[in-house]
Amino acid sequence: MRVIVHLGEPFWRTAGRREVEVVLAEGATVADAFSALKQLHPALAAELDNDEAQPAIFVSDEEARLESPLREGEKIHVVWPVSGG
């Protein structure tokens, strides 16, 4: 199945593009999509695997986790969480 990973700031700058299509097996999860994404763009591994802060993940406009299942054609949004005061 194919899914689109939409990369927010700063991830898209590392990948050089805002959207990346990845091909996954049926029954794949967000973690599987991240693995495929890191194979296509190895420099993203350091940003996505950051122990200090994890990116916020949304699938079809709903908050998701790495173990969340995916369906054909879904869009995964990966954004950096921010806070302010």
Language-model segments: which ranges?
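Ubiquitin-like/PB1-type beta-grasp interaction modules and other compact soluble beta-rich domains
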Residues: 1-84
